[in-house]
Amino acid sequence: MNASSSSHSSNSSHSLHQTFSRDAIANSLTGKSVVTLDDISTAQIRMLLDKARYIDSHRKEVAHTCDGRVLATLFYEPSTRTRLSFETAMLRLGGKVIGFAGAQLSSASKGETVNDTLKVVSNYVDVVAMRHPKEGAAFVATQAVSTPIINAGDGGHMHPTQTLADLATILARFGRLNNLTVGLCGDLTYGRTVHSLIETLCRFGNVHFVLISPDELKTPQYVIDRINDTPSCTYEETRDLMEVIGGLDVLYMTRVQEERFTDREQYLRLRDTYILTEGKLQKAKSHMPVLHPLPRINEIAVDVDDDPRAAYFEQVKNGMLMRMALESSVLGDELCGYEPTDFVNVPEDELQAVDAHGISLADPRVHTTDENAPENLSCPNPRCITNSELTLKRKFYKAESDRHEYRCMYCDEEARA
């Protein structure tokens, strides 16, 4: 359940895909921002997966797809893989890249707002990839300009392009994205990759999530609500990885993120809670891939790297390919020689799947600001951008859960009066 959608409209319970032709789906991402994968349909996700496979085997053919295009990478916090992946993706498509790596290298160090930065940069470029430490920053960017914005990670909130890499890796290993038991281990509170992956897998349905974390780093309620709202998905929570590892089809490890902690002693106490070794993998299924968004610290021992189940470096390659697919798609630039294959043949149960409130899981899932929300509402999340850029208008949506609570449009946290 995600409010940070760049496309605002009412929710629809019918499936759009039944009326889409292949060409319509292939062109339907043109000009679109992607703050969360909830912004796009499952058919569009399948299209991106299909395009990435084509790109991988047709590097020369796609090398001029984005000739004349310019990508801005606005990275307000450190990144190696994601920034280089976005930049390499555009370069391999024939485009160019400008940007900065670190807020200290931009006018943000002088106090410039995200809104103003985007209004300036959008005059120079065709598409923007933005990473920011504040949750909801990418949503702010989409409200400021019409240039397509791709969220490269907003605080501990969402990371949609990492999820695309994760989906590609899981699909390559299993040939499907459902009927799986998926373990997610480590920092589930601030792990934006975990939040994005759970929310997206829920849309494909029939997934059992095993949430493995210390009590201090449990999954946020808005993500749990999403699982609860999906009739075909279930979850369990545990502190003990070894107790459940034998039943997992996929294990997604995460690092405990020092940069998200305000209490260093708590970080030091929690950082080594889970360390996956080759010995521990002996209890796992022989086909269970180990995923990790990287960077790792010591939560996966180096001796695991040579195990055929280690899939985290595959994710890196898949991330670049998926970003190539996404960048070209939002720009409306056709891949030379590409013809859609079977991505439109979405399984009927996926087309018909609805959540507990009758909302289609296949269609984009968007929320609108509730103009009748109480005026005294505020977002209690200290990591939300509305609590640092105080000129931003507070916006809230009414959650679909039976509790009828309001949530922040920027970060999805439950609002407080």
Regions found by a protein language model. Give the residues of each.
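Cys/His-clustered metal-coordination modules, chiefly Zn-binding fingers
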Residues: 366-417
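Rossmann-like adenosine-cofactor binding region
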Residues: 227-304, 309
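Phosphate/diphosphate ligand-binding glycine-rich loop within oxidoreductases
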Residues: 64-171, 298-301
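A short helix->loop->beta-strand "cap" motif at the edges of active sites that frequently abuts
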Residues: 147, 205-207, 283-289
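Adenosine-phosphate binding glycine-rich loop
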Residues: 287-288, 293-345
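Positively charged, low-complexity intrinsically disordered leader regions
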Residues: 2-4, 13-84, 88
